[in-house]
Amino acid sequence: MGSDALAPHFDRVVLIFNPDRAGMGTRIASLEQELLAALPDLTVETLPTAFAGHARDLARSAATTGSPLLISISGDGGYNEVVNGVMDASSTRAVCTVLPAGNANDHFRSMPLRQLTEAIREGSVRRMDLLRITLTGERGQRVQYAHSYIGFGLTPLMAIGIEKGGKGKILELLSVTRTLSSLKPFELERADGATAQFDSLVLANISRMAKYGTVSEKNNPNDGQFEVVTLPHSGRWRIALMTLRAVTLGLGRQPSVSSYAFTTRNPIPCQIDGEVVHVPANTHVLVESAKHALTTI
């Protein structure tokens, strides 16, 4: 295959992005120019989002035809929408990847780095696991996928605090400090009827999270397993020590499972990648590893 040949795996590249993000117009124009210069036979489509959740609709529509490479230029939340859009398509040959343009980009940090044009030219793809969360309660059932992590308690409260407090290292640090001071434990009921109180519960498909540091020694998001990082209810100093250890030494090896289930005893916030959702009391929560569910480069 010649250096300018387009690998047959993709019939087009689709760029999905938020046009209102600062500098995005210039970045998309530059990216499109770079792709076409390296791969002149490539068809590039640009799909700007118009509202929250729109990326999911755009990805679903694009994934239903042909063999597209969907590139989300976003943070973890934007990429989550694209991934869920692809999973909404009943049968698809779509391939996904992300270019960082957000606050966390935990998924991008945890994936091997390769030149985008080189990856497209080679056409080499790989399968990765997703986390599938099923919430069942009085309002019915909701199913959603996560590419990186699902967090309860501390993780979503940090996200809410940062959103209110503003972006930037100093503002984020102040927001996290305020969050710790107002953190309340949550209670879960396991399948055997036993209950437990936690300050934090993270189910991780990746080894690193921006606000936690290294949560696991393992970084193998294609083995049908995910890591369970728990912090039972304790004093604030325990939370501070856990956070300090995560950002310095790492939390070490964590238990790996293929599924994790419980019922909420009280309302709790939940963060699915970058999106915060509020889970009502008496909701049955089932998180499973969807092995090799997503094709990526």
Model features per residue range: what roles?
Residues K164-L173, Y212-R238:
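Gly/Ser/Thr-rich active-site loops/lids in small-molecule metabolic enzymes
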Residues G78-S91:
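Short Gly/Thr/Asp-enriched flexible loops that form oxyanion-binding sites at enzyme active sites
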Residues T155-M158, Q197, R208-G213, R236-I239:
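Short acidic/glycine-rich loop or secondary-structure boundary segments that cap or lie
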Residues P19, I73-G75, L99-A101:
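Glycine-rich beta-strand-to-loop/alpha-helix junction loops that act as flexible
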Residues G2-S3, T195, N220-D223, T230-I297:
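ATP/nucleoside-binding phosphotransfer catalytic cores, i.e., glycine-rich phosphate-binding loops
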Residues I16, T49, D88-S200:
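Catalytic core of DAGKc-family lipid kinases
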